[in-house]
Amino acid sequence: VAEAVADGYRAISTEPLHGKHDLQDRITQTVMPTLAQRFGADISEISLTRNATEALHLQTLSLDLSPGDEVLITTQEHPAGHRPWMVRAARHGVTVREVFIPSPLVSVEDVISRFEAEITTRTRAIAFCHVTRGGHRYPVRELCTFARERGLISLVDGAQAVGQFPVDLHELGCDAYSASMHKWMFGPVGTGFLYVRADARDRFAPAFEPGSASTGTEYAPPGTADFPVRAALATSLAFVDRLGLANVDARCRYLSNYLKDRLSELDGCTLLSGPEDLSAPGSTIFQLDGLDAMASVPLLEELAQTHIDEHQRDGHDAIRISTHVYNTRAEIDRLVDGLEAARSL
């Protein structure tokens, strides 16, 4: 992927006009059709963005809402999914309320009932993560069906979902979905996409006029973009296709289960990931007595040459570990040894 990006920059620097056109052709003829097919969408429903954060802002700021309209989000949103709604509240008088969702998730029915309990006559939309920063996997299809039956728009943050397991956007039934390609999809930094369901377009007002080469309504800025980076998505998509997302799902789950087994050997370790159907295959979250999660981040980089993420939600002083297909059991063993060493300091 890195070499594909470099090749693109060499091409566009050597021959600016033809190099750019060749890259644009690769984007429109290979990247966009493959992206749509991979995620169960029509090409016209997808706009390329620089990341999920940009896509989340675009979907949030373009949604047709009036002063006093209400949107429900959850207490587990990433800041990138929370801040755009604060902009809508400040600029347009939209009421944004948080639905408390416990960590770990209890059940599909519990998640649905918590949303249902908060709906009022002013509620117009619900917004939530497909997979949270802590690795909790929301029942997206059930939530989107719930929203549609009540005439509500559903907006999903898929930054931590795409690439961990197969995602079919039409099957999920969401109205908008934002994703990053540089995380689990092996894409170059600076790539993501926004999906807006065709039947929901009248609820999302685009901020930009479509360019001459547009395949549909533009929700992301037209004009000159980072074409070498976007064209390199063809390489990352082909790589993921060779792996097979079902195989990625299985491998990530295998490594995550091995990690959980090793963590269970540590005294005072509490797993917070929840059951398999409500947790992402490659994300494990836990709390370890005697270990400060914030302080452990630099310690584990030093002791185990491993980057981890702290997770502070619902009073938990937790740690998140992400295991992708390229990780090994030996690396997990080194991490667990590092955790024990860090706790003893």
Model-found features: residue ranges?
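Pyridoxal 5′-phosphate
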Residues: V1-L345
